Amino acid sequence: MEVAAKLFGARLSAQKARLVADQVRGKRVEEALDILTFSPKKASSIIKKVLESAIANAEHNEGLDVDELKVATICVDEGPTMKRIKPRAKGRADRIFKRTCHITVKVAEE
């Protein structure tokens, strides 16, 4: 049985979040939490919160054993992009893209 947790509109790019997601995909939950705890990336703390939420959902909603869980799937999709303006010289302006992403973590028993 797979149990999911989702985060919509996380304030980091999907490209950077996928670097961290690839490290924990398919790992046991305890090992994945260790990897995320000691990773220096910004995405690791965000993905760790979503993973902890999925673990709590599995434990409380479905009654699954936490020691038997593994990260079944983890998906990072692009979210809406906020567009901002940065003034430049001689009346010009540059666009700034503030990217967001949607993170989905599914855990399942081994």
Curated annotation (Swiss-Prot):
It holds the Pfam family Ribosomal_L22. One of its GO terms (cellular component) is cytosolic large ribosomal subunit. Disulfide bonds: none annotated. GO terms for molecular function: rRNA binding; structural constituent of ribosome. This is Large ribosomal subunit protein uL22. Keywords: Ribonucleoprotein, Ribosomal protein, RNA-binding, rRNA-binding. This protein binds specifically to 23S rRNA; its binding is stimulated by other ribosomal proteins, e.g. L4, L17, and L20. It is important during the early stages of 50S assembly. It makes multiple contacts with different domains of the 23S rRNA in the assembled 50S subunit and ribosome. The globular domain of the protein is located near the polypeptide exit tunnel on the outside of the subunit, while an extended beta-hairpin is found that lines the wall of the exit tunnel in the center of the 70S ribosome. PROSITE patterns: RIBOSOMAL_L22. The gene is rplV. CDD domains: Ribosomal_L22 (cd00336).
